[in-house]
Amino acid sequence: MRNFQGKRIPVETIDKILNLALRAPSAGYTQGWAYVVVTDQKIRRKIGELQGESDFYAKRKHKFISEAPVLIVACISEQLYHDRYREPDKLKNDGQEIEWTIPFWYFDIGGACTIIFLATVNEGLAAAFTGIFRQQQMKELLGIPNHFLPIGIVSIGHPKKDVKSSSHRRGPRSSKDVIHYDRW
């Protein structure tokens, strides 16, 4: 969904959605995420500008960032994970922090954003996600602390008639191509 009505969304609804996201699983119960909820129209427009909305998204005729009544900027702190995994119950037998072969912080924020999507739909609303292209400028605009990284924007609003994007028209991959039991 990339086309929203401009109708206001009550703060209570956004709080309900985000409180569900706080229940997402996280490595070591670190919960290294934070969210900036943007409802101010001027700030939403600035975010749209940072994202290159007028160039890239204008081709689709929908400004789904600046025109969405609510933007949730999802942020993650790698530092909080390192801090948590230096605590006694998470150290390896040799007393050292684990080696992060997979950056769990990205997995965790992805799971939390999925819950935001599901909770949004459950409220009769629609959501769209986009990555952040100019992270440093976004941090400055929103006053995000240095140890947090803004990784994505969830645009939320009441759905408006939408035209399917070329990505959506591709359709999903076949379940037989992606689900494997016991062995690949």
Regions of interest found by a model, annotated:
Residues 1-7:
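Generic N-terminal amphipathic, Lys/Arg-enriched alpha-helix
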Residues 1, 76, 90, 152-184:
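C-terminal helix-cap and adjacent tail motif
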Residues 30-109:
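Glycine/small-residue-rich phosphate/adenosyl-binding loop
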Residues 14-22:
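Short amphipathic alpha-helical segments
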Residues 21-22, 72, 92-141:
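Small-aliphatic-rich amphipathic alpha-helix that forms the alpha element of a beta-alpha
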Residues 21, 27-30:
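N-terminal structural module
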Residues 58, 62-71, 143-165:
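A glycine-rich helix N-cap at a beta->alpha junction
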